[in-house]
Amino acid sequence: MRSERYTEVSEITKNFKVADGTNKTAGPIILCHAGTNYYDDSESHIIVDGRTGMGKSGCVSTAYAINVLKAEESLICIDPKGDLYERTAYIAEKKHRVICLDFRNPRRSPDQWNPLLGAYKYYTSSNPEHLDIACSQISEIAHSLYPTVPSTDPFWNEAAANYFTGLTYALFDSGCDKQINMDSIAEMMNASEIKCNGSFLLKDYVGFLSEDSMAKRHLVTYTSAPNDTRASIHSVAANSLSQFSRSKGLMEMLSQDTVDINNLDVCEKPVAIYCLIPDFHNTYDTLAGIFMSQLTQHFIQLAHDKYSGKLPNRINIILEELSSVGKSISSLPNLMVAARSRNIRLMLVLQDGSSQLEEVYGRSSAATINASIGVTFAFSTNSWTQLNTYSQRVGDRQIEVKGQIIKEPLITACQLAAMPIATALVLINNQYKFITKFPFYNKIFDMSGWHAPTTENKCTTEHITFNLEKCVEEKRAEKVRKALNTSKTSSEDTNDTFSPSFPLFDKNDLIAKIDARIAELEKEVEIEETEKKSTNICSVVITRINKLRVSEMVDYISDLLEISKRNVLIELNSLPVKFTCESPADANSLIEFVKRTGGQAELLE
């Protein structure tokens, strides 16, 4: 039986490179010994695992980012606290194109990003392959905004995603460049149910579209649905968008674009891209995930189209707090497999490695991700399952006790749990294993030239939104003009000898019939609305709330049910409390939100 042992320091110093500020390759710092820093510059992906406050960011990910920037490789990172940006941007400013998207302070964000613009450019391209990319991006945005939630009816979110997708195609077909933004989608949703001529605005719009229109294919299910079903779909769709549209600063940031993802390249100048998100709530995690997904897909496509499958300058991606944003990067398992050969390396930062990956991606996909990891930094964690896994990976050693050879773990789960701050077990490709204490990043690298990053806003123009009502009016007018021109042409082509001496129709009689029909349709709509209100109303009883999240709950209920925040707060102060919802979808959304925030609610039959 083989007796395992830790890797000797001499083996590390012999087989790994030194990070001295002049190195032309980069990687995570794996050992600091006798004033010398050693790093791993292989293609292997990296995972950093450990509970909060153990030094994952200060000792590992920040040092990795600095080493990457000094070696003039490219860097992309999701930065929940803004630490990476604050600590490393001054280095990036020297040789890199620096892009910073700040979801914490959207009005002050140095850069702006329009999640629809890249797809729009592909959609309007003459290259048929680009149309496929556009469709894929639109679908990914839709399913990130409306994900399928386990143990709930998938119909509503899938229908809402289809509705959003149809509106996006409609915007691409009918809007101009400056109108392509999320604010336009929100305005289109608001206007879609406007009553007109006994119908509603979106149904009229769809009626003008050709049968092979992508917009019509996705919207016809919505426009032909019964009133109560349509109202519920609309409620679910608008509710997910409201978390963005309620912030004017955020909507402004998402309506401009200084990033221009489709034209990013790393050949002439490396890039340093920082995506800053709040660490005290997860409202913008979805957007950060979409942004990261668009970036990675672009660079993989760029490697394929321009560089024979491998980028000339390595891109290093740091995903801090992956458990939060991971759901919006649904393609991560495939990315882990595809990235390595494209010269893209990822570092995943988690608090409970395997269990968080399984929670976000499922067991099979989590196994794919773990199989792609070559370098592991294991700090102390609260998960005994994870600690036992690391203990088993290190292996057993043989010892002699009273003349007998027995085996015991080289390190136990308890010993791993007891590791102090900044101390980690390092595992590299199942070949090297050792425990080391890391200094803070500013002890590893000289930070004497540090200064705060430049935060100048690069965009000054205002965005405009698409007006669905005006578009429908123009399409109606165009249809009338074409009909009149056709009638006029037909009349001119007819020989006067054979023309009838009486009018083809009585204009006043026709107008009277049209008015009567409109009145009938409006009466039908009124009856349908009355029936919908009487049969569709639901009541939700809230019996318990999480007092630490009352403010969040007040905002949500106020927006969902259009009740003043003051009245909501008064109601919540005397539990149990009943709220009346206009649709089953609203009721289900409210119940799910209350439970998700630690409360209890149920539908009142």
Language model segments and positions:
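Generic structural marker for isolated residues within well-ordered, non-membrane alpha-helices
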Residues: H45, L387, V554
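Short hydrophobic alpha-helical runs that function as membrane-insertion/retention elements
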Residues: E73-I78, V98-D102, R345-L350, T376-S380, ...
